Amino acid sequence: MIEEGLLLPMNVLLQGQKLTLLDPEMWFLRGNENKDVTLVITIGNNHQKLMVVEDILLLIDRSQIEVTAGKVIYHPLRIDILSKLLAFIDESTGSVEREHHELFADALPFASEVVLFSKVASEAWFLATYLSSDNINEILFQHLRKTECYKLVRYLLSQSLIQTSLYDLGELYGVSYSHFRRLCSYALGGKVKTELCGWRVARAVLEIIEGNSDMTTIAHKYGYSSSSHFSAEVKSR
């Protein structure tokens, strides 16, 4: 059940233990399990103290975490799922990456633990959160925009109309071909070429529905040899 949603297996940090995060992470902590906990989160010479008084989503940047009191019981969350979804939303609205605020850890009150057990439920919760007018949610969106997954999906979407190889995409992104494939597999949650082909089909179908041009013209625009080739691709999905 855990493996189907955002919630990953429980971890524990004891008093005095330290943990170094190399990438932004998101944790779920239950207030009743972490009543006497104090965390100190450090980046360089900057320190931030955090105490847990309720169920929270803990958003942590690249940093070192030290437990100075109590025992931390937490579940890491699959940040890639929400980062990918936000990347699609931002791409569709033409949003540009905003400046990040100065804090490198934030605790957001979270009373919807049940949604974390299902990918569908968590995505529905996230979309509802995005559409709400509560400004505090912008902290979550800013955090997700810091992730490699978000940046990679935005990059792939920006390049999706260009007929180019994964090798060339990786080179332009600034990493080796093998590392680029690994990054893409994690960010997309599946086979890279299959996912990119799916995006191409979806964009082409959307243009046809919107009536922007005829099928043959759109098929050629998206790299299909003919309208028959495009139709066959759509039917295969």
PLM regions: where:
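Key DNA-contact positions within bacterial/archaeal DNA-binding proteins
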Residues: 178, 182, 227-228
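N-terminal regulatory/effector-sensing and dimerization cores
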Residues: 1-98
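Terminal helix-turn-helix DNA-binding modules in bacterial transcription factors
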Residues: 186-226, 231
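Solvent-exposed, amphipathic alpha-helical segments
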Residues: 103-110, 148-159, 203, 207-211
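Short, Lys/Arg-enriched, Trp-marked, Pro/Gly-tolerant hinge/linker segments that flank
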Residues: 112-176, 186-198
